[in-house]
Amino acid sequence: MFDVLMYLFETYIHSDADVMVEQNELTDELSRAGFDKDEIEKALNWLERLANLHDSEREVYVAASAQGSMRIYAPQELARLGTECRGFLLFLEQAQVLNAETREICIERLLELDKPDIELDDLKWVVMMVLFNVPGSENAYQQMEELVFDESDGVIH
């Protein structure tokens, strides 16, 4: 499923291609590209749920977060998000790339991936997908894009 998400993001989102594509047409294109129908369906459902997080009248993930508060991870989150991923999420929040709400959306989307262990690169791409989808997050998206594509500058401190 993650490979399908990456393909879609790189093909349609990151390349500024026409994003308005019929689902059947998209499914056919992905099948021709060699992706399994089940994986395609999972990826499209994942994206639909991401889009619905902002379109629905659901309660906000985090109503308020006190300055200096720390996110405590549940056991199932700890099992899938290693120290490196959790540290990077904290870094992104401290750098104001993520806020409490977008952090929670990222965690929820990461846990819905069909991967037992989530790697740092997976996290970076999911954060970009989330920020791309959140209205008003253009600057945060641009910062994240620089972090992902300008890794040759060295380690981030």
Curated annotation (Swiss-Prot):
It comes from the Bacteria. InterPro entries: Smg. Belongs to the Smg family. NCBIfam families: PRK03430.1. This is Protein Smg homolog. The gene is smg.
